[in-house]
Each structure stands twice: as structure tokens, then as C-alpha cells.
């Protein structure tokens, strides 16, 4: 019996990487009865008589699990954010950060298309990047697009990790991957095609070795449209709120209508990003409204 990592799934086959070699395997027969589905990124125990014929016997404990894309053990989310005025959205950025936090995945923010900005707008983005760094996020915001310094920072963050790349269509995800690993044009082109097809995405899921890490070559982490959490849990996924909440008068304060709220006091004092608080309020209302719909199902 061997231990390896599933690097690709396609049509019921799982390609498992172990000891420098790839093995083509299937899931053992009782997986379907037990409703167990191996995922790309799973660490597994398997037997293989030859590299072309083997069986996955057991799936080791998963650290994280995503639905879209269906990948296990992702521990880094590279958030590619287009910074041009017509594309930039702190709302989308904060949605992505909350979704990653809920999934237990560390974010890396990459501000793209900075070379298209005027100096004035770039300074605004730089100020915002510094504000996110103060919250505790790692942010890359170089003046020159895909500069050696920016790419080196991504490579350092990626080394030894399993990552998904997320961001709106056209943000620069494919271009970033091409710069990190020249020669990936075909694979990243497939990402773009899948994104443009909307729901009709490829059913093949793979992990591509890039910069001493692994990147899922799927349309990306896209399950951030709806948060599957309770509204009163949302505050736990805003790190700056968590730090301040110890000084709120009421335990369980959600920082909206409560008196003597440390978060609202910090906001009034200009110590919090107003956009972050505004987005928090919108997400809170969205979750409250969605929960009613969920409870009516079935």
C-alpha cells in the first residue's frame, strides 16, 4: 500500500502522485455505497500493480474542502483583483476574503492591472493595500504589472501550498499564472474558456505544479456569492472586528445597533475602513434574508 496525493480527476479516474510518479487509479467499490467521493488534493492510501492500474483504498483526513472547485486541502487563496476604476470593487474583494476565512484558507491579495492606472489612482490603491495589510492580510500592489518583485512574492507565498486562484473574469488570473510558469498558455486558456462558458465548465479538475506549489486549474473558487453561515457569525470573519470586539459592552455584539460598540467607535474615529464596515452591513443583511429562504427548502 502506498500514500499519495490525487492530482487529477477525470471520468471516474484519479491520477495519484507518489514517490515522483503518477498512478492512474479508480475508487474502491464501496466508496459509492458509502457516498464517499475522492477529491483532487486528497491525500490517499492506494494500491497499484502498475502505474496504469490501481485503486484508492482510503482517504486521509481533509484539512479543507471546497465545493466549487471540488478540491481538498487547499490552504492558499490567491485573490487577483483588477484595480482599474471600472472594475475595482471592495465589495467583491471583501466577499472573497470572508469566503476564504469561512473555508479556513489563507488569502493572498494580488492587485492587478496597476500599470493601467494614473499615478493618482495608483496612490489610492496603494493606500488601500496598506490598510488591508494593517488588518493582517498579505497584499501585493506593485506599480509595474507582474514585476519581478511581485512575482517573487507570489512564488514565495505559493511554495509548499495548494492554491486556488480567484477573481472576476478578466482580472488577470490567467496572465498571472503564465508569468509564474511560462509555457502554461494552454492550461490557463482553458481556465478562461471555462469562465466564459459560465455554468458549462469542464469536469476535469487538476493540480498544476507551479513555483514549488500546486494550483487548481479550474475556473477558481467561486462559491462566495452566498455565505453558508449565520448572520451573527459574520463578525468572526472580519479580523479587525474580532480584535476590537473584546471592548464592546455586550458579549455577542454584532456591531450594528448595540450601544457602546468598540467597532462603531473605531469607525467614528476613522480607525476602520468605512468600506469594510459598509460591506459588512450588506453581507449581514444578505445572510439574514438568505437564511429564511434556506429554512423553507424541503
Swiss-Prot record:
The keyword RNA-binding applies. It comes from the Bacteria. Binds 1 zinc ion per subunit. One of its GO terms (biological process) is ribosomal small subunit biogenesis. It is found in: Cytoplasm. Residues 63-224 form the CP-type G domain. Its cofactor is Zn(2+). Zn(2+) binds at residues 248, 253, 255, 261. Its EC number is 3.6.1.-. It is an enzyme of class 3 (hydrolase). Keywords: Cytoplasm, GTP-binding, Hydrolase, Metal-binding, Nucleotide-binding, Ribosome biogenesis, RNA-binding, rRNA-binding, Zinc. GTP binds at residues 112-115, 167-175. Its main location: cytoplasm. InterPro entries: G_CP_dom (IPR030378), NA-bd_OB-fold (IPR012340), P-loop_NTPase (IPR027417), Ribosome_biogen_GTPase_RsgA (IPR004881), RsgA_GTPase_dom (IPR010914), RsgA_N (IPR031944). GO terms for molecular function: GTP binding; GTPase activity; metal ion binding; rRNA binding. Belongs to the TRAFAC class YlqF/YawG GTPase family. RsgA subfamily. NCBIfam families: ribosome small subunit-dependent GTPase A. PANTHER family: SMALL RIBOSOMAL SUBUNIT BIOGENESIS GTPASE RSGA (PTHR32120), SMALL RIBOSOMAL SUBUNIT BIOGENESIS GTPASE RSGA 1, MITOCHONDRIAL-RELATED (PTHR32120:SF11). One of several proteins that assist in the late maturation steps of the functional core of the 30S ribosomal subunit. Helps release RbfA from mature subunits. May play a role in the assembly of ribosomal proteins into the subunit. Circularly permuted GTPase that catalyzes slow GTP hydrolysis, GTPase activity is stimulated by the 30S ribosomal subunit. Monomer. Associates with 30S ribosomal subunit, binds 16S rRNA. This is Small ribosomal subunit biogenesis GTPase RsgA 1. It comes from Lactiplantibacillus plantarum (strain ATCC BAA-793 / NCIMB 8826 / WCFS1). The gene is rsgA1.
Amino acid at each position: 500500500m502506498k500514500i499519495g496525493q490525487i492530482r487529477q480527476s477525470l471520468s471516474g479516474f484519479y491520477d495519484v502522485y507518489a514517490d515522483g510518479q503518477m498512478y492512474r487509479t479508480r475508487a474502491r467499490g464501496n466508496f459509492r455505497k458509502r457516498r464517499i467521493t475522492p477529491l483532487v488534493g486528497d491525500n490517499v492510501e492506494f494500491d497499484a500493480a502498475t502505474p496504469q492500474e490501481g485503486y484508492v483504498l482510503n482517504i486521509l483526513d481533509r484539512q479543507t474542502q471546497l465545493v466549487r472547485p471540488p478540491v481538498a486541502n487547499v490552504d492558499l487563496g490567491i485573490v487577483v483583483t483588477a484595480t482599474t476604476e471600472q472594475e475595482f470593487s471592495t465589495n467583491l474583494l471583501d466577499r472573497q476574503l470572508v469566503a476564504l476565512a469561512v473555508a479556513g484558507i489563507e488569502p493572498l491579495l494580488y492587485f492587478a492591472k496597476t500599470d493601467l492606472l494614473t499615478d493618482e489612482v495608483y496612490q489610492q490603491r496603494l493606500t488601500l493595500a496598506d490598510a488591508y495589510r494593517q488588518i493582517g492580510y498579505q497584499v501585493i500592489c506593485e506599480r509595474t504589472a507582474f514585476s519581478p518583485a511581485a512575482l517573487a512574492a507570489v512564488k514565495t507565498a505559493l511554495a509548499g501550498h495548494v492554491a486556488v486562484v480567484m477573481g472576476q473574469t478578466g482580472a488577470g488570473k490567467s496572465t498571472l499564472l503564465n508569468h509564474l510558469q511560462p509555457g502554461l498558455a494552454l492550461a490557463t486558456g482553458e481556465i478562461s474558456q471555462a469562465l466564459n462558458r459560465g455554468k458549462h465548465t469542464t469536469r476535469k479538475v487538476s493540480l498544476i505544479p507551479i513555483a514549488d506549489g500546486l494550483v487548481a486549474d479550474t475556473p477558481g473558487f467561486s462559491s462566495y456569492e452566498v455565505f453558508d453561515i449565520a448572520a451573527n457569525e459574520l463578525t468572526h470573519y472580519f479580523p479587525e472586528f474580532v480584535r476590537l470586539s473584546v471592548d464592546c459592552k455586550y458579549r455577542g455584539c454584532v456591531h450594528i445597533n448595540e450601544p457602546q460598540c468598540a467597532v462603531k467607535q473605531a469607525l467614528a474615529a476613522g480607525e476602520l475602513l468605512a468600506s469594510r464596515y459598509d460591506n459588512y452591513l450588506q453581507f449581514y443583511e444578505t445572510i439574514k434574508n438568505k437564511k429564511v429562504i434556506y429554512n423553507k427548502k424541503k
